[in-house]
UniProtKB/Swiss-Prot annotation:
The chain crosses the membrane at residues 131-151. This is Protein PLANT CADMIUM RESISTANCE 6. Keywords: Membrane, Transmembrane, Transmembrane helix. The gene is PCR6. It is a single-pass membrane protein. InterPro entries: PLAC_motif_containing. It comes from Arabidopsis thaliana. Its main location: membrane. PANTHER family: DUF614 FAMILY PROTEIN-RELATED (PTHR15907). It is found in: Membrane.
C-alpha cells in the first residue's frame, strides 16, 4: 500500500478555515460607530447640535408704587415709635372741638375714661372694667386722678407726646375732665375712635385694608 498523501488540503489551511475567519472578523459595535460619527462628523468637522428653541419671555412684572401691603389682617394698632416728641393735635382746653364728648365727660366721666382705657390698652382693659374702677376710686377716695393719669402716660409713650402743659398727675389732678376730653380727641384724631371700642377699631382697620387691596393699582411701572 502506498503512503497517504500528506499534502494539506485547502480546507485545512488556516487561510481558508471558515472558523478562523469567523473568529478573526470582529463584530461592528453600532454604538461606537454612532458616537464616532457624532464626534467626527462628515460635514467638514462641524458638530451637529440640536436646535435651541428660544425661550418665550414671561409676562411683565408690575410694581405698585402707590402702596405696599405686607401685614396680615388683625395686626396690632399700636402707634409708631417716635424718636422725637410730637405735639398734641388739640389743646387741653379745646373741649368744645367735640361738644358731644365734652357733654358726656361732664356728666359721666367714667364712660369717657373707660373708652379711652380700652383703646390705649388695646383691649386688655375693657371699658366696663375701667369705668367701674374709676367710679370705685372716686367714691372711696375722691381722687380718680391717681388712676387716670397712668393712662395719659401710656398715651404719651405710645405717640411720643410731650409732658405738657404739666406733668400727667398734675394735669389730671386740677383739670380732670379737660384732660379726659383731650385724650379722647387725641385718639380720635389719630384714627382710633374710642366710642366703638378696641374690637370696633380692629374691624374698621381690616375693612380699610381690604378696600385698599381691592382698589385698582395706581402709579405702576413695567419691568422688562
Amino acid at each position: 500500500m502506498g503512503r497517504p498523501d500528506q499534502t494539506p488540503s485547502p480546507r485545512m489551511n488556516n487561510n481558508f478555515n471558515p472558523v478562523f475567519h469567523a473568529q478573526s472578523e470582529q463584530p461592528v459595535d453600532e454604538k461606537r460607530v454612532l458616537q464616532a460619527e457624532q464626534i467626527y462628523p462628515n460635514n467638514g468637522g462641524v458638530v451637529n447640535q440640536p436646535n435651541q428653541v428660544p425661550m418665550r419671555p414671561g409676562p411683565p412684572t408690575y410694581i405698585n408704587q402707590s402702596a405696599t401691603f405686607n401685614q396680615p389682617y388683625g395686626v396690632s394698632m399700636a402707634g409708631p415709635v417716635h424718636t422725637q416728641p410730637s405735639n398734641w393735635t388739640s389743646g387741653l382746653f379745646d373741649c368744645m372741638n367735640d361738644g358731644e364728648n365734652a357733654l358726656i365727660t361732664c356728666c359721666f366721666p367714667f364712660v369717657t375714661f373707660g373708652q379711652i382705657a380700652e383703646v390705649i390698652d388695646e383691649g386688655a382693659t375693657s371699658c366696663g372694667t375701667a369705668g367701674m374702677l374709676y367710679g370705685l376710686i372716686c367714691c372711696l377716695f375722691a381722687i380718680p386722678c391717681v388712676y387716670t393719669c397712668t393712662f395719659r402716660t401710656k398715651l404719651r409713650s405710645k405717640y411720643g407726646l410731650p409732658d405738657a402743659p404739666a406733668p400727667d398727675w398734675i394735669t389730671h389732678c386740677f383739670c380732670e375732665y379737660c384732660a379726659l376730653c383731650q385724650e379722647y380727641r387725641e385718639l380720635k384724631n389719630r384714627g382710633l375712635d374710642p366710642s366703638i371700642g378696641w374690637i370696633g377699631n380692629v374691624q374698621k382697620q381690616r375693612m380699610g385694608q381690604q378696600q385698599e387691596m381691592m382698589a385698582p393699582p395706581m402709579g405702576q411701572r413695567m419691568m422688562g
